[in-house]
A protein has these predicted regions:
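Conserved ABC ATPase "signature" region
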Residues: 70, 122-141, 250-251
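A short, proline-enriched helix->beta-strand linker immediately N-terminal to the Walker B motif
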Residues: 165-169
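Short catalytic/signature loops enriched in Gly
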Residues: 137-141, 231-286
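Conserved ABC transporter NBD signature motif
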Residues: 58-70
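A short, surface-exposed alpha-helical micro-motif characterized by mixed small hydrophobic
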Residues: 213-215
Length: 286
């Protein structure tokens, strides 16, 4: 049974569609990638799940179920409680995600104390254990540090520890290595996968990088213009992508085993055809 079930989810900004009848499932313990170029709607799906969509965006239809509960049918306070107990986010930029004027310790323990009702002592002990688990040396010192006193990679490790603090059943990782240099990216990807396997957490990995998908994901969903174009197992996708856009996206991805590869951008014809298809679908449903 899927832990996360999204069915026919649609959203708009005014008259402009942002998500178009999106359906996808993530099973317990599964690692699924959400793939697409900028503006495809990847992050909007994550925000819709977590209830953090910008105020101007309105959900116009569909369901989002976490462990069988339809989040969109819950009152705001109940929805926050359910999400706080079952899901967490690893954000893109650790520097902006962390509060610059608060020490690291309270930023990890706040969720445990405020949402789950843990004692401060138990929450601090849990935070120390998690910082050690994500391979941060001297966790006690880091608990007392401010974000600016840590490197980018250390800050991202803090956010990973924070995401796993309440033992969520679903982690949404929103391009979590974008703000890091290449050598640190590899370490963080390995750490996320290690933590996901150890805690048997479902992972929805938002990315535009198919190389990352190949390293850590089992399945993927390809988006364009807020619409799902293809779903596949990762091995099957890389062997034989089915949708023309998926094939073009794969052809535009550098292969480190072929330094002489000629990269082919996604043909404008495919983009034009997709945009025309989306405009036609919009006219027939309004």
């Amino acid at each position: 049974m899927s832990f996360l079930e999204i069915t026919s989810l649609s959203a708009r900004v005014g008259p402009v569609p942002i998500l178009r009848n999106v359906s996808l499932n993530v099973a317990a313990g599964e690692v699924r990638a959400l793939v697409g170029e900028s503006g495809a709607g990847k992050s909007m799906i994550g925000k819709a799940i977590l209830g953090t969509l910008p105020g101007a965006i309105r959900i116009t239809g569909g369901e989002i179920r976490l462990d069988g509960q339809n989040l969109l049918a819950l009152r705001p306070a109940e929805r926050r409680r359910v999400i706080g107990q079952t899901a967490a986010l690893i954000p893109q930029d650790p520097l902006t995600a962390l509060n610059p004027v608060r020490r690291i310790g309270p930023q990890i323990t706040r969720r445990l104390v405020d949402i789950l009702g843990w004692s401060k002592r138990d929450a601090e002990a849990r935070a120390l254990d998690l910082l050690a688990e994500v391979h941060i040396p001297d966790p006690k010192r880091v608990m007392q540090s401010y974000p600016h006193e840590l490197s980018g990679g250390m800050r991202q490790r803090v956010l990973i520890a924070s995401a796993f603090a309440a033992e969520p059943k679903l982690i949404i990782a929103d391009e979590p290595t974008t703000a890091l240099d290449v050598t640190v990216q590899k370490q963080i990807l390995r750490l996320i996968k290690e933590m996901q396997e150890r805690h048997n957490t479902a992972l929805l990995f938002v990315t535009h990088d198919l190389g990352v998908v190949a390293k850590i994901c089992q399945n993927l969903t390809v988006l364009f213009g807020g619409k799902v174009l293809e779903e596949a197992a990762v091995e099957a996708f890389f062997a034989a992508p089915q949708h023309p856009y998926s094939r073009a996206l794969l052809a535009a991805t550098p292969k480190y085993t072929d330094p002489d590869q000629n990269l082919t951008p996604v043909p404008q014809r495919i983009i034009d055809d997709l945009q025309a298809e989306l405009r036609f679908a919009e006219r027939t449903t309004t």
